[in-house]
Structures are given as structure tokens and as C-alpha cells.
Regions:
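Signature of long, low-cysteine stretches enriched in small and polar/charged residues
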Residues: 94-167
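Secretory pathway targeting signatures of secreted, lumenal, and periplasmic proteins
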Residues: 38-120
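Short acidic/polar N-terminal linker immediately downstream of export determinants
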Residues: 24-37
């Protein structure tokens, strides 16, 4: 997902193949990560040569490198209550409900001062998705690369999140706009430009995912 210079790409090619650590709940097949549930597989967005790392649990996988890539993909199976909420509320209200009660609540539990910068329902993406942007004080995943702010100022990370339902699983894709904290005051993108960067990166991740068809739909 990050842009690499031609020289760096050439160096990587000369180094030969590298592998990710295999101590994970899911599995690596070629250039793809397969979730523990088998519900999806995704083209891996990081390179081990650039410090790329994969960590996961039965529900969440995280991809991160040493430069500016931080992506998490969560897949939560809907129980009977959640399926009922989804069917009675409709896609938009259900995703807002899920985001507020689970995703946002989790951020607020871990970081003080979390704010919703904006949110938008996108009916044309994944048959209805919720796109949100969060400001997370002290929530960057790249603390060692933060540009000095002076005084007691705390860097405010920005996360783009995309929520949708697929095959009775709620998916939450989350990406940090790492450049915002790495470059600090030198980062000159407007809020609208930042949102567009995150939106494109989120959609790129969706394009990397292949979902497993429900058992009844398989031939």
C-alpha cells in the first residue's frame, strides 16, 4: 500500500524471497493470509523485507511494517441477536449501531479523547457500508517515528474504518494514516485530502479480499 522508490524495489528484488513468521492462528498461502475461520483470504499488504509483520487472533488480523502501513481486518460472526438487529434495523442503522456499541466503544476504552471526525453510509460499497474517520490522541501505531511536537503535546492519530456485513459476519477494516503523525507539522494535507487517501486505501484492501461462499452456495 505504501509507495516505494525504484531503488528500494530493486534492492528487495535482489534480496530474494523472504517469509513471515508462522506463529499465527490463520495461515499463509503464497502471498495471501487465510483467516482462522476460513471465511476470507487477503493479499498481504506488507513485505517482510520492510519489517512487515502479521499478528492475529481468531477474529482480527493486523498487518504492519516499519514505514507507514498499519491495517487491521476484523470479522465478527453474527449470533441470533445480531442477525435480528441487522434484519430489523436495516444496513445503515445496523452498521451505525455496531460501530457505536462495539468499535467506537473499544477505541474509547483504550484511548482517552477519541473523537468521530466524520461518518458516511456508502450504499454502493459491499451492498452498504459505513465509512468513519476517527481522531485518536496517543493512538498511533508508529510511536517511535512520531515527529516531535514540543511540550506535552500528544500526537493525534487518524484512523479510517470501513464496516460492512458479508455472509453473516461483520467486517471492520481499519487503517491508520501514518504520515499524519510521522511528518507532524510538515504534513500539509487538508481534512478532505486525508479522508480521500484513507478512503482509497480502505477500498484497496476490500479489493484484496476474497470471501468464502456460504456452504449452501458452494457447488
Amino acid at each position: 500500500m505504501s509507495r516505494l522508490s525504484p531503488a528500494l524495489l530493486l534492492l528487495i528484488a535482489c534480496l530474494g524471497p523472504a517469509v513471515f513468521a508462522q506463529d499465527i492462528a490463520g495461515k499463509i498461502e503464497g502471498k495471501s493470509y487465510v483467516s482462522p475461520t476460513g471465511q476470507f483470504h487477503v493479499q498481504i499488504p506488507v513485505l517482510p523485507e520492510l519489517g512487515g509483520d502479521i499478528t492475529d487472533t481468531p477474529n482480527v488480523v493486523t498487518f504492519q511494517d516499519d514505514f507507514n502501513v498499519y491495517v487491521s481486518i476484523a470479522a465478527f460472526q453474527q449470533d441470533a441477536t445480531q442477525r435480528w438487529e441487522n434484519s430489523t434495523r436495516g444496513a445503515k442503522d445496523y452498521l451505525v449501531y455496531f460501530f457505536s456499541n462495539f468499535v467506537l466503544a473499544d477505541f474509547k476504552q483504550n484511548f482517552e479523547g477519541v473523537q468521530i471526525e466524520s461518518a458516511k453510509f456508502v450504499p454502493g460499497t459491499m451492498e452498504g457500508s459505513l465509512l468513519t474517520y476517527l481522531l485518536v490522541p496517543g493512538g498511533t501505531m508508529f510511536p517511535e517515528r512520531v515527529s516531535p511536537l514540543g511540550g506535552d503535546a500528544v500526537p493525534v492519530a487518524k484512523r479510517g474504518n470501513l464496516l460492512f456485513v458479508r455472509n453473516s459476519f461483520v467486517y471492520v477494516i481499519s487503517i491508520e494514516l501514518a504520515e499524519r503523525v510521522i511528518e507532524g507539522k510538515a504534513y500539509g494535507k487538508s481534512t478532505e485530502e486525508q479522508d480521500e487517501i484513507l478512503r482509497k486505501r480502505l477500498l484497496d484492501m476490500v479489493d484484496r479480499i476474497t470471501f468464502t461462499a456460504p456452504a449452501a452456495a458452494r457447488k
